[in-house]
């Protein structure tokens, strides 16, 4: 995990005490020697343009090593997003590994109401895309009989 160690050291150097947590999540969160495609969440106390610029180079190197761009947010965004990203937070809570700093995962509370709303939104969005794709690609009434 050479790339991960380098990233953490760079984040600590650039953000100092402002770096709250680095959390791995997703399917490779608990794979000890994951070489790439490791999802990370970086949480800071405050986040502004200067902070984003400071961490841009290390994150660009991380992405160049075939990793997804980390989710970067401040502490306020972390606590105010449980309703909007209910599915994502529920997934993170089930499969994560604290890489650095404070373990914020126990603070996650996903209300079932918001989880249902996000699931419904996702399903309805997919249904709309499916219908639009059907409308744009149907060539004859014979094709309808296949459905």
Segments (PLM) and residue ranges:
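Conserved NTP/Mg2+-binding pocket subregion across the NTase superfamily
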Residues: 59-146
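Metal-dependent nucleotidyltransferase catalytic core
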Residues: 1-16, 30-36, 40-85
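Residue-identity detector for threonine
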Residues: 20, 44-46, 107, 121
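Residues immediately flanking
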Residues: 27, 44-46, 96, 102
């Amino acid at each position: 995990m050479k790339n991960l160690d380098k990233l953490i050291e760079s984040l600590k150097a650039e953000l100092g005490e402002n770096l709250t947590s680095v959390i791995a999540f997703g399917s490779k969160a608990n794979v000890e020697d994951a070489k790439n495609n490791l999802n990370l969440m970086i949480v800071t106390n405050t986040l502004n343009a200067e902070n984003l610029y400071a961490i841009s180079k290390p994150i660009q190197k991380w992405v160049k090593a075939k990793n997804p761009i980390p989710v970067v947010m401040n502490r306020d965004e972390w606590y105010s997003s449980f309703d909007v990203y209910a599915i994502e937070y529920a997934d993170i809570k089930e499969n994560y590994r604290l890489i650095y700093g404070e373990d914020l995962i126990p603070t996650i509370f996903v209300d079932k109401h918001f989880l249902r709303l996000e699931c419904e939104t996702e399903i309805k969005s997919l249904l709309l895309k499916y219908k639009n794709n059907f409308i744009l690609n149907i060539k004859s009434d014979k094709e309808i009989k296949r459905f």
